[in-house]
Amino acid sequence: MSVMFDPDTAIYPFPPKPTPLSIDEKAYYREKIKRLLKERNAVMVAHYYTDPEIQQLAEETGGCISDSLEMARFGAKHPASTLLVAGVRFMGETAKILSPEKTILMPTLQAECSLDLGCPVEEFNAFCDAHPDRTVVVYANTSAAVKARADWVVTSSIAVELIDHLDSLGEKIIWAPDTHLGRYVQKQTGADILCWQGACIVHDEFKTQALTRLQEEYPDAAILVHPESPQAIVEMADAVGSTSQLIAAAKTLQHQRLIVATDRGIFYKMQQAVPDKELLEAPTAGEGATCRSCAHCPWMAMNGLQAIAEALEQEGSNHEVYVDERLRERALVPLNRMLDFAATLRG
């Protein structure tokens, strides 16, 4: 059974688009960042959804491009004393939870996530208090405070396996915050899930009619879908999975043309994986609507070269991530449970 809970959330105002840099300015900041990374004994960790030039810089400087969990794991294992996290705020918090001894910097602490914003801790605590018999499972896309309330943290790459495991133990679940991913997991496992109703502003915009028209235009294309997308979009997919799983699917599918329903930032690494294949963006407009995100997270776009240089140079309250130690210790428990469970899956 899956029962939906819908918090009263407002439509989130988007941040202003960063001012474009000239070619000369980009070259200046790239060299400055490379120098500052060496001087600070720092390493860049960037999410798949950041802009291509940011991912490229992370590659060139020995950093990491991955999903939020692997970003934090990479940072925890890396000998650098400072981590520059190019992503959104919960990713910086997760890095700090796993690496409290390190300095965690972000280009801006104003880089939000609609899933995080849609799950305020006070309301979530009250929701959990009303259902004390349920195991609390929260998606990685949540604040440190919400993680601290959870029994488990989960990423999309192991969500089905974890919920299937908990269901086999007879446990009833509270799932937060992504309703689409929650529905997908419930359908795959049959688990008893009480689901918080949040959504990713990017994946929530994919449209079935527009996708159908694109599929008709390219009938030889496979459709790759992130499970944060609406159920109707997921049902059209040839492959469903997390960011890393979609990149893997792009390599294994025989199709030479791929329609990709996730943030277009993933195209940088996906195209590297399948250089001979054509990648098409799944449509986010149509059916009488225009897109707001247009397949790219506006907060991810805040991770620009100038902001990265400023973070490495200025530090301070505008760039450094802090997590209260007692909160960090509580949030670390469900995170470590997830890491241990993921290790068993890898064998």
Curated annotation (Swiss-Prot):
This enzyme's EC code(s): 2.5.1.72
Role noted for this protein: Catalyzes the condensation of iminoaspartate with dihydroxyacetone phosphate to form quinolinate.
HAMAP family: NadA_type1
Co-factor binding details: Binds 1 [4Fe-4S] cluster per subunit.
TM helices/strands, residue ranges: none
Organism: Escherichia coli O127:H6 (strain E2348/69 / EPEC)
One Gene Ontology cellular component annotation held by this UniProt entry: cytosol
Catalysed conversion reaction: iminosuccinate + dihydroxyacetone phosphate = quinolinate + phosphate + 2 H2O + H(+)
GO biological process: 'de novo' NAD biosynthetic process from L-aspartate
Positions of [4Fe-4S] cluster binding: C113, C200, C297
Chain positions recorded as iminosuccinate binding sites: H47, S68, Y139, A140, N141, S156, H226, P227, E228, T243
Protein family (similarity comment): Belongs to the quinolinate synthase family. Type 1 subfamily.
Pathway, per record: Cofactor biosynthesis; NAD(+) biosynthesis; quinolinate from iminoaspartate: step 1/1
SUPFAM superfamilies cross-referenced by the UniProt entry: NadA-like
NCBIfam families noted in UniProt: nadA (TIGR00550), PRK09375.1-1 (NF006877), PRK09375.1-2 (NF006878)
Catalytic EC class: transferase
InterPro entries: NadA, NadA_sf, Quinolinate_synth_A_type1
Needed cofactors: [4Fe-4S] cluster
Gene Ontology terms for molecular function: 4 iron, 4 sulfur cluster binding; metal ion binding; quinolinate synthetase A activity
Cell compartments where the protein resides: Cytoplasm
Name by which UniProt lists this protein: Quinolinate synthase
